[in-house]
Amino acid sequence: MKKIKIAAGLAHVDYGHLADIVKEVTEAGAEYIHSDAADMHDLKNMQLMGGHQIIEGIRSHTDKPIECHIYTKTCDLLFIEKLAQVGTNMLILPAEHFIGAPLAYIINWCRERSMKVGLTIGLYTPLSFIEESIYDIDRLHIVVHGVDETDGKDNWGWRSSCLD
């Protein structure tokens, strides 16, 4: 039987007590720390959150791997470099925004910095989106977020607008 691994997410925490929260979930047995980074476009109800500053602030408070799940439409070498410098172990990208050559470059940049790579794919996104990269990634997340509070519709997450 496979062991279930628990990642402690930091999206809805009191950032004034972040170090204490990270210590607490580490001691409670979380296998990963899951941080998010969002721009002002993809995740409208949680704008401009996270990033390398958060990871830099918590790195010394846990020995667990820290993954950074980005909700952005772009990801350049400078961003990856900053994440690597502060001790990020895995970068998780939305497949709908990073397909083909851009994703291949990002995977290579991460590997050169000893980082793992994951992809998220929305519930209604065709699996063909990840066909060419499935063997190059370390993890795949199927995103099934609930009702979008911004408009009250059952759109199953922030990426549904990418497929309209």
Report the location of each language-model feature.
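Short, aromatic/basic amphipathic alpha-helical patches
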Residues: 106
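Short, acidic/turn-prone active-site loops that include or flank metal/cofactor-
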Residues: 95-99, 144-149
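Structured N-terminal alpha/beta-domain signature
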Residues: 90-93, 109
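A glycine-rich beta-strand to alpha-helix segment
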Residues: 123-126
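Internal catalytic-core helix/loop-beta-alpha segment
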Residues: 116-121
